[in-house]
């Protein structure tokens, strides 16, 4: 299996055709959804996919599309997640999600990630840091839930900021205690000197 991650303009015509064929085979035919898969959002997305050789042609074994956030909806969206029928009993989906999360974090480190998944797959996505945000709701007649994975860098930045604030206060308290011991008095903020 050969893994790829690229923007739309870097997809070859052969790879694009294989991706659209796989998306239609799984998301339209297998899932019995009557919708237009080509929705005009592919040009601005990252495409994470795996190909396998079948004779002379390469077929898409796994695929996920990653849409960037914007001013109205800042969350990055992972959608069109699929694996071919031949890759459903192995760890291909796990590898796909790991690669999609890595690509999304590299491209948009400060953004939360959102996805819509079949309600029965919630536990699987929780393994990757997603939590239920809303739903269930019906999508093409099947129950789905919206899941979100909080931004990691923003959370890390907040932890750093809080840690610095606590450390700075602790340092000021230590300095006041040391100053008080050196001069034989309590720190001014203790209230005992009043």
Placement of each model-derived feature along the sequence:
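Short amphipathic alpha-helix that is part of the acyltransferase structural core
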Residues: 1-44, 51-59, 160-163, 172-173, ...
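Short glycine/proline-centered loop/turn elements that form peptide/ligand docking sites
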Residues: 97, 119, 138-143, 177
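Short strand-connecting beta-turns/loops that link adjacent beta-strands
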Residues: 43, 55-56, 71-73, 140, ...
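Conserved catalytic-core motifs of GNAT/GCN5-like acyltransferases
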Residues: 126, 131-148
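Conserved GNAT acetyl-CoA-binding A-motif
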Residues: 104-118
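A conserved beta-turn-beta hairpin within the catalytic core of GNAT-like acetyltransferases
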Residues: 68-78, 88, 109, 138-141
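Conserved acetyl-CoA-binding loop-helix of GNAT-fold acetyltransferases
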Residues: 83, 88-103
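Conserved beta-strand in the GNAT
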Residues: 49, 57-69, 74-82
